[in-house]
Amino acid sequence: MHYPKVYDVIVIGGGHAGTEAALAAARMGRQTLLLTHNIETLGQMSCNPAIGGIGKSHLVREIDALGGAMALAADKGGIQFRILNSRKGAAVRATRAQADRVRYKAAIRETLENQANLDIFQQAADDLIVEGDTVKGVVTQMGIRFDAKTVVLTTGTFLGGVIHVGLEKSSGGRAGDPPSIALAQRLRELKLPVGRLKTGTPPRIDARSVDFSVMTPQPGDFPSPVMSFMGDVSMHPEQVNCYITHTNEKTHDIIRGGLDRSPMYTGVIEGVGPRYCPSIEDKIHRFSDKDSHQVFLEPEGLDTHELYPNGISTSLPFDVQFELVRSIRGMENAHILRPGYAIEYDYFNPQALKFTLETKAINGLYFAGQINGTTGYEEAGAQGLLAGLNAARRAWEQEEWTPKRDQAYMGVLVDDLITLGTKEPYRMFTSRAEYRLMLREDNADQRLTTIGRELGLVDDVRWAAYCEKMEAVERETSRLQHLWAAPNNPMGKKFVEMTGADLSKECSAIDLLKRPNINFGQIAELTGSEVSQQVGEQIEIAVKYEGYINRQHEDVAQLKRLEETKIPADFDYDVVSGLSREITQKLKTVRPETLAQASRIPGVTPAAVQLVMITIRKNNMTKKTA
């Protein structure tokens, strides 16, 4: 059947990348189709039941600032919230939400089903319709042809997915779901640069068989933080504890004894696993000097006894899993509900993409999520939103948009993938961002919501809330600038009495806030401030880090000169005199769009960038005189 409706955007896959891609395109007014092999698994948390964490929550806040769904779903489904790095600087603080899988998934599905311009259809995609070098649509498993101006592929671990438990293997996109074989073969036919990656998950445990009394409880923060700029604590369901236990020498001996049947250590799995989320087999091998490793028992939800033992991801045979679980303190009688497993899947070298996440080889075809070599819900959601918005803009022949490294962690993510490529699952960290003081979790809305509004991603309700917040920040900052404390006036005396600090000369309340040991709560009490915690936090960080932030702005201004020098798409690196063969090949492979991007390619020297710049200028002058 040839479906009668022509879509602007078709999104294949209903995971974290696919849902954000479909929602973004539909919010922008494009006729959008979301194809999923199973409507019941939309927004499924395939691995750990958590959103956020170091570097990751910055991405979640950016998705949220652009109108995305992930943060609000985390607030509606979060059963424990914590601020990580709370004693460190503002740049590296991160919110983490332990999520109820069912509630989170329900929140995502509700958002999808109530989104205007979005159709959902349950059917696996088997083929892409490609005419010449342009995608024209999708063919489903049943042979239904859907036509579209653009297509976004968000296939997760489903492309050629193989599940491993010990030396046993089976085809699957994740436990209980079939893989995407026909589509994987079709993509290989298109000569896109394909590789294999691997990820894994731990066995799930029945909480009724665990002795929590010998474990360390890990409560959430109080008052509970929220994930979304539109979130409220009243959205949160009941809050619960996680628990901490540890592996031991017996556990490690059991694991070592099973390595001869491990698919990772016998060469059965060829795909590379995530460096920063290693399996328990990897941990005892790489960190053989350690006597134990932490295990976090995380509830999967309020209406289930299922626990996620974070820290013991494994693909060892089930009999070994059974023994290793029962060797851990408090889990001596543990019942395993689901075995752990590893999954191997196809991914495509992200250097074959443009910075808009469109493939260089096929016009109108976009990739987002694990297909690009990343790991994590947050990384997937960020790519999905960007791919969805750019597919939407291309469909209407509008200029596409990707944030720069100084604008967003999304920009860092995309720039790293396209410029550097990846041979192992890529995870976001704050350390990857050179301008992290400007790219804080708390100011994602200041950085992106105005842009999102211009792009059509941000609705009236979110825009009004953002404008109200920014007006409150401006009003309160102005008020504090005009309140003065002096050694002999009432405000000055109250300040000294409250804080025990010295006050030798007259200064404004803003100047008092600049002091290292003074926080906004104290200034609010001193001056009778009634603004929200969010507004107070914004003011405090802006005041305390003003000098550092200004220096980063100066660095950005210098970089912009390189960013503004575009490299023509048809630029011939072979004619650049003095460029080594190795550097020429690297530049031809990546085809950077600006001199700044060229400078970030490993092995491309400042001298090489200078040679390219000189050649571009010569070419431009030749064109002018011609």
Swiss-Prot record:
Q: Which GO terms describe its molecular function?
A: flavin adenine dinucleotide binding
List cellular component terms (GO): cytosol
Cofactor dependency: FAD
Keyword Cytoplasm on entry: yes
Chief localization: cytoplasm
Per its UniProt entry, which superkingdom is the organism in?
Bacteria
Keywords associated with the record:
Cytoplasm, FAD, Flavoprotein, NAD, tRNA processing
Keyword NAD assigned? yes
List of residues binding NAD(+): 273-287
User: Where does this polypeptide localize?
Assistant: Cytoplasm
Q: Which Gene3D superfamilies match?
A: FAD/NAD(P)-binding domain, GidA associated domain, C-terminal subdomain, tRNA uridine 5-carboxymethylaminomethyl modification enzyme MnmG/GidA
The residues listed in the UniProt record as binding FAD, with positions renumbered to this chain, are 13-18
Record-linked Pfam families? GIDA (PF01134), GIDA_C_1st (PF21680), SAM_GIDA_C (PF13932)
Annotated GO biological process: tRNA methylation; tRNA wobble uridine modification
| Summary of subunit composition and partner proteins | Homodimer. Heterotetramer of two MnmE and two MnmG subunits.
Q: What family does the Swiss-Prot or TrEMBL record give for this protein? A: Belongs to the MnmG family.
What is known about what this protein does? NAD-binding protein involved in the addition of a carboxymethylaminomethyl (cmnm) group at the wobble position (U34) of certain tRNAs, forming tRNA-cmnm(5)s(2)U34.
Protein's recorded name: tRNA uridine 5-carboxymethylaminomethyl modification enzyme MnmG
The species this protein was found in: Acinetobacter baumannii (strain ACICU)
Q: What is the lineage of its organism?
A: Bacteria, Pseudomonadati, Pseudomonadota, Gammaproteobacteria, Moraxellales
